[in-house]
Swiss-Prot record:
Residues that coordinate or bind [4Fe-4S] cluster: 39, 42, 48, 141
Protein name: Anaerobic regulatory protein
Chain's gene name: fnr
Dimerization: annotated span: 159-178
Molecular function via GO: 4 iron, 4 sulfur cluster binding; DNA binding; DNA-binding transcription factor activity; metal ion binding
Keywords in alphabetical order: 4Fe-4S, Activator, Cytoplasm, DNA-binding, Iron, Iron-sulfur, Metal-binding, Repressor, Transcription, Transcription regulation
SUPFAM superfamilies linked: cAMP-binding domain-like, Winged helix' DNA-binding domain
Species per Swiss-Prot/TrEMBL record: Pasteurella multocida (strain Pm70)
Domain of life: Bacteria
Classification of source organism: Bacteria, Pseudomonadati, Pseudomonadota, Gammaproteobacteria, Pasteurellales
Subunit structure comment from the entry: Homodimer.
Gene Ontology CC: one annotated term: cytosol
Length: 273
């Protein structure tokens, strides 16, 4: 009887030790709701903050990141006027950012894909000037800004990567202005589709076949065109043999023609959309 109790105690002790060991080894997984993917294992890390960091620096960054539960479609990540507490790195899904005018009109400012960071525009006033909303079920990594700012002061590579990402966002804004001011409706839509293709390709997805996660209304809002114009232009591109369109699914049949139509070769547009 005594031996049986000792054996039971030993088994319980071993189990507890294993649990404690696992908590120490993968403590971040426990804190983040069981998420097993970390910066070192993330397939899109080359597009995000971890790019160029060594293993020790990655561990320091990884320790401050919170992996949030899935954000459901239409759920808002933050609202205009919210204080800047964190930046958000998109792991999967699509997030749109937008502002709302005094008259209540929505203006979409970007569509963010996996590897993109959301929230940079809040740094100047430490307050979000825009909204961020999921267009589909999405996963994000939440990065506390104060801690990230402190870490970047100690890690030159991290600071350089943040500056590179911010510079890219400024470049995208400039190219968006050029897109809206210099291109006609057909060129705008062609540039939009081509750059989605390019961005999906950079993330390891097909450059020729993909699903539009945004509605035609969203695309029109972003490009300054009506829904009817978007539908008409998609039909025209399909008749020209450049695209095949089935609902939200796009197949690019003639990439060269799409690039030429987008005016990319003339204006060198490489917007991040």
């Amino acid at each position: 009887m005594i031996l049986f109790e000792i054996d039971q105690f030993y088994i319980i002790f071993v189990v507890l030790i294993k649990v404690l060991f696992m908590d120490t080894k993968i403590g971040r997984k426990v804190q983040s709701g069981g998420c097993a993917i970390h910066c070192q294992d993330c397939s899109i890390s080359q597009l995000c903050i971890p790019f160029t960091l060594n293993e020790q620096e990655l561990d320091q960054l990884d320790n401050i990141i919170e992996r949030k539960k899935p954000i459901q479609k239409s759920q808002v990540l933050f609202k205009a006027g919210d204080p800047l507490n964190s930046l958000y790195a998109i792991r999967s899904g699509t997030i749109k950012t937008y502002t709302i005018s005094e008259t209540g009109e929505e203006q979409i400012t970007s569509f963010q894909l996996p590897g993109d960071l959301v929230g940079f525009d809040a740094i100047m006033n430490m307050q979000h000037p825009s909204f961020a909303q999921a267009l589909e079920t999405s996963m994000v990594c939440e990065i506390p800004f104060d801690i990230l700012d402190d870490l970047s002061g100690k890690m030159p590579k991290l600071r350089q990567q943040i500056m590179r990402l911010m510079s890219n966002e400024i470049k995208n804004d400039q190219e968006m202005i050029l897109l809206l001011s210099k291109m006609n409706a057909e060129e705008r839509l062609a540039a939009f589709i081509y750059n989605l293709s390019r961005r999906y390709s950079a993330r390891g997805f097909s450059a020729r076949e993909f699903r539009l996660t945004m509605t035609r209304g969203d695309i029109g809002n972003y490009l300054g065109l009506t829904v009817e114009t978007i539908s008409r232009l998609l039909g025209r591109l399909q008749k020209m043999g450049i695209l095949s369109v089935q609902g939200k699914y796009i197949t690019i049949n003639d990439m060269v023609a799409l690039i030429e139509l987008s005016g990319t070769t003339k204006t060198n547009i490489k917007m991040g959309i």
